[in-house]
């Protein structure tokens, strides 16, 4: 007869997949931190911002990030974006990334890892601004600790206003 106790000596949860006594790995408690930023981006410029939990969180591990960006721009314009992981802080965006395509330059290829990429193109009637947005849910595998850095990098073909919100799922 199977026991209903797991290895730590406490009774396990019953789930449809594990109805009785198999041990299960208890999940680490996570917390969600929401960060809201807005900026005016210049034409033909590579800019970026760091994605990290705000506040007095000293030690953490980010497991996943939900990223939402809303852009207000003229029709026919383009915004490229990258989500990158880096072991050291990036001081100059134009020194690390090429301008229209957002490729990592050769001098920085050993320290920057591309996690996700995409583009936003606007359509509409000339003379009016349109609002576009994108949502990305990024799973970070083993996670990003407080010593590593996660950035979203943007290239815009026109000056525009961007509102960036991200929800960080943190294991504390």
From Swiss-Prot:
InterPro entries: Nanovirus_coat. Disulfide bonds: none annotated. Pfam families: Nanovirus_coat (PF04660). GO terms for cellular component: T=1 icosahedral viral capsid. The keyword Chloroplast does not apply. Residues 11-20 have a biased composition (Basic residues). The keyword Oxidoreductase does not apply. Residues 1-26 are annotated as: Disordered. Its main location: virion. Belongs to the nanoviridae capsid protein family. This is Capsid protein. It comes from Faba bean necrotic yellows virus (isolate Syrian SV292-88) (FBNYV).
């Amino acid at each position: 007869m199977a026991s209903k106790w797991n290895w730590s000596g406490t009774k396990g949860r019953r789930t449809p997949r594990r109805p009785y006594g198999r041990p299960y790995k208890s999940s680490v408690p996570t917390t969600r931190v929401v960060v809201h930023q807005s900026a005016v981006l210049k034409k033909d410029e590579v800019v970026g911002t760091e994605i990290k939990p705000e506040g007095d969180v000293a030690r953490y591990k980010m497991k996943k990030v939900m990223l939402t960006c809303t852009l207000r721009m003229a029709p026919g314009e383009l915004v490229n974006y990258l989500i990158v992981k880096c072991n050291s802080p990036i001081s100059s965006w134009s020194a690390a990334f090429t301008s229209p395509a957002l490729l990592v330059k050769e001098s920085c290829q050993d320290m920057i890892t591309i996690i996700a990429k995409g583009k936003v193109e606007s359509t509409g009637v000339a003379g009016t601004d349109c609002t576009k947005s994108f949502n990305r849910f990024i799973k970070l595998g083993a996670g990003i600790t407080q010593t590593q850095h996660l950035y979203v990098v943007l290239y815009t073909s026109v000056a525009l206003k961007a509102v960036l919100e991200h929800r960080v799922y943190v294991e504390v």
